[in-house]
């Protein structure tokens, strides 16, 4: 195993904070573009469906906040602080989520996901000590540090952790079927 280096979250790729189109305009909603919010299921690795969707009109209001597939999204406010998912297609998030469009030449997407899960747990723990609603803004989020090995080691670690996640998902499905 090689040396692990400290890397700021902002160095992992482009950081994008989500935006919400005007909710008073109903034509902004109900289209085919996923609109991820912390109330969506962020307990899974990949977000495949969102409760809300945007139309092309809604997208035009927040066009500079569109995320490509394989972006790592981190909820950065309130009781949902620290939840993490990866997008599976172009997605918009609301302003409660900071996302990383990972620099794939230097970092493995799945490794970044797992690193953000660890950071998310730390953020959530810290938030429990505050009486105010905890918020992690884009600049604070970008300045947090994580440890990263070489890209090759990141890929190896991600393969092992992903296999474990798949096994856990299979076991949950089996348990759900047995309980039914």
Identify what each model region corresponds to:
Residues 1-20, 143-158, 162-180:
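Non-catalytic DNA-recognition/assembly elements of restriction-modification systems
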Residues 2, 77, 91-98, 129-158:
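A short glycine-rich beta-alpha junction/loop motif
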Residues 5, 32-34:
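A generic secondary-structure signal marking the coil-to-beta-strand transition
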Residues 6-26, 39-69:
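Sequence-specific dsDNA recognition surfaces
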Residues 22-30, 127-129:
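Short coil/turn segments at secondary-structure boundaries
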Residues 37-39, 51-119:
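A short beta-sheet element
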Residues 47, 54, 84-86, 123, ...:
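Short clusters of hydrophobic/aromatic residues that line enzyme substrate/ligand-binding pockets
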Residues 110-140:
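Short, positively charged
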């Amino acid at each position: 195993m090689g040396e692990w280096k400290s890397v700021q979250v902002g160095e992992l790729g482009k950081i994008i904070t989500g935006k919400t189109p005007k909710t008073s305009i109903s034509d902004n909603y109900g289209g085919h573009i996923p609109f991820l919010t912390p109330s969506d299921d962020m307990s899974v690795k990949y977000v495949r469906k969102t409760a809300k969707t945007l139309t092309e009109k809604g997208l035009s209001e927040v066009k500079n906040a569109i995320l490509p597939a394989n972006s790592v999204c981190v909820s950065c406010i309130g009781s949902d602080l620290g939840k993490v998912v990866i997008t599976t297609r172009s997605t918009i998030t609301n302003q409660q989520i900071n996302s990383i469009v990972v620099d794939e030449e230097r970092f493995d997407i799945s490794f970044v996901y797992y690193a953000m899960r660890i950071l998310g747990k730390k953020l959530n723990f810290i938030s429990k000590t505050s009486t105010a609603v905890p918020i992690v803004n884009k600049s604070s989020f970008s300045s947090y540090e994580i440890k990263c090995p070489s890209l090759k080691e990141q890929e190896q670690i991600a393969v092992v952790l992903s296999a474990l996640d798949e096994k856990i998902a299979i076991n949950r499905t089996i348990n759900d079927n047995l309980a039914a």
